[in-house]
A protein has these predicted regions:
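Intrinsically disordered, low-complexity and often Lys/Arg-enriched segments
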Residues: 1-7, 124
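Conserved, well-folded catalytic cores of nucleic-acid-processing
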Residues: 12-15, 24-27, 46, 50, ...
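SF2 helicase catalytic motif II
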Residues: 165
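Walker B catalytic acidic pair
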Residues: 168-169
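Helix-rich C-terminal "collar"/helical-bundle subdomain used as an assembly and partner-interaction module
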Residues: 6, 22-23, 100-102
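Interdomain "pre-motor" coupling segment immediately N-terminal to P-loop NTPase/helicase cores
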Residues: 10, 14-66
């Protein structure tokens, strides 16, 4: 169990505490250390869970989704969309090979819903960094950046993302 606590402390970047824990347990566990071990394990688990939730919350805000959508809310029965393909895409494995996904269809067919739902799945289940843009908003931001003589900042920001969603491409 000591290895688990030490590993957990290091994974939380608490290296000083990991070293102190190792020193405390080096000479064999005393009754005092053993009695506090369960508390430390629970605190580490709580901290790990809290950090994960805060990270997801931060990534969701950073993504700037127009609305929160998920795949459970999409009516596959009323659509011609291939449900199996969408579920396969929901793990965002296509981002590892830098492949693109293009959703094509008329107004009201669920393109934005699906793009948002796939992105939300990436953030919440696969720790992906996502940025959602209306294409018009992105073009306006790039123009503003150019006028301010600060070109390249948006491009650098987008390069750090695992997935960039460009919505409403047809309205350009």
């Amino acid at each position: 169990m000591d290895v688990d606590i030490k590993t957990s402390l290091k994974s939380l970047r608490l290296h000083g505490m990991a070293t102190a824990w190792e020193e405390l347990t080096e000479g064999g566990q005393t009754t005092r250390v053993q009695s506090s071990q369960w508390l430390i394990e629970h605190l580490l688990q709580a901290e790990d869970t809290n950090r994960e939730l805060r990270s997801i919350s931060h990534q969701m805000k950073t993504a700037r989704f127009p609305l929160h959508r998920d795949l459970a809310g999409f009516d596959f029965a009323a659509s011609q969309v291939d449900k199996a393909l969408i579920l396969k895409l929901s793990d965002l494995s296509f981002t590892q090979d830098a492949h693109n996904v293009v959703l094509i269809g008329g107004p009201g067919t669920g393109k934005t819903h699906l793009a948002t739902a796939l992105s939300v799945s990436g953030v919440t289940r696969h720790s992906k960094k996502v940025r959602f843009y209306s294409t018009v908003d992105l073009v306006n931001a790039l123009e503003h950046e150019k006028l301010m003589n600060k070109p390249g900042r948006i491009a650098q920001s987008l390069a750090r993302q695992d997935l960039v969603v460009l919505d409403e491409l047809g309205y350009l």
